[in-house]
Amino acid sequence: MNAMLIVAIVIAIIGTIPVIIRKKLLKNYLTLLQNNDIKAIKDLMATKLAKICIPPFNREYLLLNAYLKLKDDKQIDTQVNNIMDHVPMNSKQKSALAKSVFYIYVDNKNASMIDRLLEMVSTTNDHALYRQMDMVNDTLISGGIKYYDELKSDLEDEEYTKNNEDTPYLEFLLSVIYKNMGNESKSKEYKNKALEDSKGTVYESLIKSQN
Protein backbone atom coordinates (compact mmCIF):
# COMPACT_ATOMS: atom_id res chain seq x y z
CA MET A 1 0.00 0.00 0.00
CA ASN A 2 1.23 3.50 -0.85
CA ALA A 3 2.94 5.13 2.15
CA MET A 4 1.02 8.39 1.72
CA LEU A 5 -2.25 6.47 1.62
CA ILE A 6 -1.34 4.69 4.87
CA VAL A 7 -0.59 8.04 6.52
CA ALA A 8 -3.90 9.45 5.29
CA ILE A 9 -5.80 6.44 6.69
CA VAL A 10 -4.03 6.70 10.05
CA ILE A 11 -4.79 10.43 10.27
CA ALA A 12 -8.44 9.76 9.39
CA ILE A 13 -8.71 7.08 12.07
CA ILE A 14 -7.04 9.27 14.69
CA GLY A 15 -9.36 12.12 13.73
CA THR A 16 -12.46 10.00 14.31
CA ILE A 17 -11.42 8.86 17.79
CA PRO A 18 -12.27 12.14 19.60
CA VAL A 19 -15.61 12.25 17.75
CA ILE A 20 -16.50 8.71 18.85
CA ILE A 21 -15.45 9.41 22.44
CA ARG A 22 -17.35 12.71 22.43
CA LYS A 23 -20.53 10.96 21.29
CA LYS A 24 -20.13 8.37 24.03
CA LEU A 25 -19.55 11.07 26.66
CA LEU A 26 -22.62 13.00 25.53
CA LYS A 27 -24.70 9.82 25.57
CA ASN A 28 -23.58 9.19 29.16
CA TYR A 29 -24.33 12.83 30.00
CA LEU A 30 -27.90 12.57 28.69
CA THR A 31 -28.51 9.42 30.72
CA LEU A 32 -27.22 11.12 33.87
CA LEU A 33 -29.25 14.23 33.07
CA GLN A 34 -32.44 12.19 32.82
CA ASN A 35 -31.67 10.79 36.27
CA ASN A 36 -30.85 14.26 37.67
CA ASP A 37 -27.49 12.88 38.83
CA ILE A 38 -25.59 16.16 39.14
CA LYS A 39 -22.61 14.72 41.02
CA ALA A 40 -22.03 12.12 38.33
CA ILE A 41 -22.32 14.80 35.63
CA LYS A 42 -19.71 16.94 37.41
CA ASP A 43 -17.44 13.90 37.71
CA LEU A 44 -17.95 13.08 34.03
CA MET A 45 -17.09 16.62 32.89
CA ALA A 46 -13.96 16.54 35.07
CA THR A 47 -12.54 13.39 33.46
CA LYS A 48 -9.44 13.61 31.28
CA LEU A 49 -11.38 12.27 28.30
CA ALA A 50 -14.01 14.99 28.65
CA LYS A 51 -11.33 17.66 28.94
CA ILE A 52 -9.62 16.34 25.81
CA CYS A 53 -12.72 15.82 23.66
CA ILE A 54 -15.12 18.54 24.84
CA PRO A 55 -14.11 22.24 24.70
CA PRO A 56 -14.12 24.15 28.03
CA PHE A 57 -17.23 26.24 27.31
CA ASN A 58 -19.20 23.20 26.19
CA ARG A 59 -18.29 21.27 29.35
CA GLU A 60 -19.34 24.11 31.64
CA TYR A 61 -22.47 24.79 29.58
CA LEU A 62 -23.54 21.14 29.85
CA LEU A 63 -23.19 21.39 33.62
CA LEU A 64 -25.20 24.63 33.60
CA ASN A 65 -27.96 22.87 31.65
CA ALA A 66 -28.17 20.27 34.39
CA TYR A 67 -28.70 23.00 37.00
CA LEU A 68 -31.27 24.65 34.74
CA LYS A 69 -33.18 21.37 34.49
CA LEU A 70 -33.28 21.15 38.28
CA LYS A 71 -34.16 24.87 38.58
CA ASP A 72 -31.43 25.22 41.19
CA ASP A 73 -31.07 29.01 41.23
CA LYS A 74 -28.11 29.03 43.60
CA GLN A 75 -26.07 26.62 41.49
CA ILE A 76 -27.18 28.36 38.29
CA ASP A 77 -25.85 31.64 39.67
CA THR A 78 -22.56 30.06 40.71
CA GLN A 79 -22.08 28.34 37.36
CA VAL A 80 -22.96 31.42 35.29
CA ASN A 81 -20.44 33.49 37.23
CA ASN A 82 -17.87 30.71 36.87
CA ILE A 83 -18.31 30.66 33.10
CA MET A 84 -18.23 34.45 32.76
CA ASP A 85 -15.18 34.81 35.00
CA HIS A 86 -13.05 31.88 33.88
CA VAL A 87 -14.11 30.47 30.49
CA PRO A 88 -13.08 32.17 27.21
CA MET A 89 -16.14 32.68 24.98
CA ASN A 90 -16.76 33.79 21.43
CA SER A 91 -19.77 35.93 20.46
CA LYS A 92 -22.06 32.97 19.76
CA GLN A 93 -21.23 31.37 23.10
CA LYS A 94 -21.86 34.61 24.97
CA SER A 95 -25.24 34.93 23.27
CA ALA A 96 -26.12 31.31 24.04
CA LEU A 97 -25.27 31.78 27.71
CA ALA A 98 -27.31 34.99 27.95
CA LYS A 99 -30.35 33.44 26.25
CA SER A 100 -30.24 30.47 28.64
CA VAL A 101 -30.39 32.46 31.88
CA PHE A 102 -31.51 36.04 31.21
CA TYR A 103 -35.22 35.53 31.95
CA ILE A 104 -34.43 33.60 35.12
CA TYR A 105 -32.72 36.73 36.43
CA VAL A 106 -35.62 38.86 35.21
CA ASP A 107 -38.08 36.65 37.11
CA ASN A 108 -35.87 36.90 40.21
CA LYS A 109 -35.34 40.67 39.64
CA ASN A 110 -31.60 40.12 39.97
CA ALA A 111 -30.45 43.49 38.62
CA SER A 112 -26.74 42.90 39.18
CA MET A 113 -26.67 39.70 37.12
CA ILE A 114 -28.82 41.29 34.42
CA ASP A 115 -26.29 44.12 34.20
CA ARG A 116 -23.44 41.60 33.91
CA LEU A 117 -25.19 39.77 31.09
CA LEU A 118 -25.97 43.04 29.29
CA GLU A 119 -22.35 44.11 29.54
CA MET A 120 -21.24 40.73 28.19
CA VAL A 121 -23.66 40.77 25.24
CA SER A 122 -22.67 44.36 24.41
CA THR A 123 -19.25 42.99 23.43
CA THR A 124 -20.78 40.66 20.81
CA ASN A 125 -22.19 41.37 17.35
CA ASP A 126 -25.65 40.14 18.42
CA HIS A 127 -27.26 43.57 18.42
CA ALA A 128 -30.81 42.20 18.25
CA LEU A 129 -30.31 40.20 21.44
CA TYR A 130 -28.79 43.18 23.23
CA ARG A 131 -31.73 45.39 22.23
CA GLN A 132 -34.22 42.76 23.43
CA MET A 133 -32.46 42.36 26.77
CA ASP A 134 -32.08 46.11 27.25
CA MET A 135 -35.77 46.62 26.46
CA VAL A 136 -36.82 44.04 29.05
CA ASN A 137 -34.38 45.39 31.62
CA ASP A 138 -35.44 49.02 31.19
CA THR A 139 -39.16 48.16 31.24
CA LEU A 140 -39.45 45.42 33.86
CA ILE A 141 -36.48 45.99 36.15
CA SER A 142 -35.77 49.74 35.97
CA GLY A 143 -39.41 50.82 35.58
CA GLY A 144 -38.45 52.91 32.57
CA ILE A 145 -40.25 54.09 29.44
CA LYS A 146 -37.24 54.22 27.09
CA TYR A 147 -38.88 52.00 24.46
CA TYR A 148 -42.38 53.52 24.57
CA ASP A 149 -42.30 55.25 21.16
CA GLU A 150 -40.67 52.29 19.44
CA LEU A 151 -43.06 49.68 20.85
CA LYS A 152 -46.15 51.82 20.28
CA SER A 153 -45.15 52.41 16.66
CA ASP A 154 -44.37 48.72 16.05
CA LEU A 155 -47.64 47.51 17.55
CA GLU A 156 -49.69 49.99 15.53
CA ASP A 157 -48.23 48.50 12.33
CA GLU A 158 -50.61 45.68 11.34
CA GLU A 159 -48.18 44.10 8.88
CA TYR A 160 -45.47 44.03 11.53
CA THR A 161 -47.65 42.47 14.22
CA LYS A 162 -49.32 39.97 11.89
CA ASN A 163 -46.02 38.36 10.90
CA ASN A 164 -44.19 38.72 14.21
CA GLU A 165 -44.33 35.83 16.66
CA ASP A 166 -42.98 38.17 19.36
CA THR A 167 -46.09 40.39 19.24
CA PRO A 168 -47.68 39.04 22.48
CA TYR A 169 -44.55 39.77 24.49
CA LEU A 170 -44.17 43.23 22.95
CA GLU A 171 -47.79 43.92 23.93
CA PHE A 172 -46.97 42.81 27.45
CA LEU A 173 -43.94 45.11 27.61
CA LEU A 174 -46.02 48.05 26.37
CA SER A 175 -48.62 47.30 29.04
CA VAL A 176 -45.88 47.52 31.67
CA ILE A 177 -44.59 50.77 30.18
CA TYR A 178 -48.08 52.26 30.43
CA LYS A 179 -48.15 51.11 34.05
CA ASN A 180 -44.77 52.77 34.60
CA MET A 181 -46.29 55.95 33.13
CA GLY A 182 -49.29 55.73 35.47
CA ASN A 183 -51.79 55.02 32.65
CA GLU A 184 -53.69 52.09 34.19
CA SER A 185 -56.43 51.88 31.53
CA LYS A 186 -53.95 51.53 28.65
CA SER A 187 -51.87 49.15 30.75
CA LYS A 188 -54.88 46.91 31.27
CA GLU A 189 -55.82 47.10 27.58
CA TYR A 190 -52.43 45.87 26.39
CA LYS A 191 -52.08 43.33 29.18
CA ASN A 192 -55.35 41.71 28.11
CA LYS A 193 -54.18 41.72 24.48
CA ALA A 194 -50.92 40.08 25.49
CA LEU A 195 -52.64 37.38 27.53
CA GLU A 196 -55.07 36.63 24.71
CA ASP A 197 -52.52 36.64 21.89
CA SER A 198 -49.99 34.57 23.84
CA LYS A 199 -52.32 31.58 24.31
CA GLY A 200 -50.64 28.45 23.00
CA THR A 201 -47.36 30.24 22.27
CA VAL A 202 -43.93 30.07 23.89
CA TYR A 203 -44.70 33.40 25.56
CA GLU A 204 -47.81 32.31 27.46
CA SER A 205 -46.05 31.02 30.58
CA LEU A 206 -43.40 33.76 30.40
CA ILE A 207 -46.00 36.54 30.40
CA LYS A 208 -47.96 34.91 33.21
CA SER A 209 -44.80 34.48 35.31
CA GLN A 210 -43.89 38.15 34.89
CA ASN A 211 -47.45 39.45 35.13
Model-derived features with residue positions:
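Extracytoplasmic/periplasmic C-terminal soluble domains
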Residues: 138-211
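Acidic, Ser/Thr-rich low-complexity segments on the non-lumenal side of membrane proteins
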Residues: 41-73
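N-terminal signal-anchor transmembrane alpha helix of single-pass membrane proteins
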Residues: 1-29
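Alpha-helical repeat scaffolds
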Residues: 40-48, 73-86, 110-125, 146-162, ...
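Residue at a conserved register position within TPR or TPR-like alpha-solenoid repeats
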Residues: 32, 67, 101, 105, ...
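Alpha-helical transmembrane signal-anchor/signal-peptide segments
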Residues: 26-38
